[in-house]
Amino acid sequence: MKGKHRVGLGALVLVLLMATVAYPVLLYTDNAFVSKWRTLYIETAMSTMSHQWLATAFIPQSIIDEVMQTRAETTELQRTAESTWNVGDVTSAIVESEEIEDDEERFYTLFNELDKKSFESYLEDHEDVLEKGWDRIAIDKCDEESDTGIRTKQGDTVLAISAKQGILIVAVKGETYRGRLAIVKDASRVELKTCEELFDVGQYIKDIAKDEDAILAINASGFIDADGVGNGGTPYGYLKVAGKELQGPYEHGYKIVGFDEDDLMQIGDSNITDNLWDAVEFGPALMVDGESKLKSASSGWGLQPRTAIGQAADKTVLMLVIDGRSTRSAGAT
């Protein structure tokens, strides 16, 4: 019995030591590793609707306020975020490739992100890929999640290539996240679509894609979620589809993003809406005209599932989806 009492007392002493020593250290240390994860923990908890107590229950409000100050500073940076480019600033990747006569050279010019050596190795092992020619190359390993061995020049794994559709899909991963990046070469094919019963009941993306006969789809914006029981039928903020304005801007610190008639993605406020064909309102804007519009990597939002869209200087559209809130992928900053 005495042995059990000693074990119990030892455990109690250990808990007390952790409470009196480890807890203050975790809260106030400037250690880079601890500070990084403390900040991400607070930001992630405070960015939820119903789980903010995970931070407020045992972290002093002063520390929470200090961490969340970066969100306010990012919001201030967002006020001046507005793109300024026009059609004279770009050359289309599609146009550049079409000017080349050799099929192989045209393929590598269009998909300039590909690491040529790794793709050649793949072709050696899969001779059937070229049976219909370079302009009909079609590889799709997205569902299998297997390593194709094909790499981008940055070292990411390529999961799918469609020469006919002008689409490349890449697996992206980091310390806390996994996701997919779709690289779309023809910006004119990117369109904004809505759920069938807009302002009434929402739809899953896969169902909207099926209805519209789309081969690729991602979320465009958030939706009104009153008291956490919204049905996804009403999008958050400005909405313009095929030149028709369906909902006005909210302008609560978010930006309007959309495509103009030259297929250029523009970012700004309500003053740019007349020039847009398709547009939504959300945020934050990450980069505008090549410059960051964030105060820090996380900017007060922590680790979350993410959807992002961007456009390169050659009009290539980048569509990114990051999984989150799972053991496999906590999310990205």
Annotate each predicted stretch with a short phrase.
Residues 288-333:
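Domain-core and long-helix interface of multi-subunit machines
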Residues 183, 215-219, 258, 310, ...:
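Structural recognition of the beta-strand scaffold that forms the well-ordered cores
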Residues 223-298:
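Active-site-adjacent helix-turn-beta-strand microarchitecture at beta-sheet edges
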